[in-house]
Amino acid sequence: TLGLSMMVVALAQARASGAVQGAMAATEATVEGPFFWPGAPEVPLGADIAEGVPGEPTLYMGRVTDVDGKPLAGALLDVWSGDGDGKYDVQLSAEPTMKARGRLRTDAEGRYWFWSIRPTYYPVPDDGPVGDMLRATNRNINRPGHIHLMVSAEGHVPLTTHIFVAGSPFIDEDV
């Protein structure tokens, strides 16, 4: 199930990227996951999107470029993560609080930076077929700490990816 989901994402990304000027995807795509929620607020560069969730304050920064390394000014990043206890806002209430979520645009050099928390590992929901499969294959149910980014820019194929916390438990066993 998990391998097939990732294969579908990889093939779709390759097909979509190839349709845009014969380009290859420079960053591997991943599944959106169950915790994405549309409508996060757009915030300025440097904002703190954590809004008081538990966890270690962390500055995230990077650069969005095209496949040739040219900066993508004005690219939109939709960011979301769990908190320092391994929970997403949508797991804690019926409606998302939009904490540890935000949308921001890159500057003229394609750079972005924002504050949030350093997310920790968490177990995937294992009460359905995914849990059955993980148990049957003797795989770990935990995901290492990570943040999600959905990146879109005019003339480019949207990309959903994630950035893992270095040294996070289970980093070598991600489901």
Where are these regions (language model features)?
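Beta-strand-dominated extracellular/periplasmic modules and repeats
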Residues: 5-175
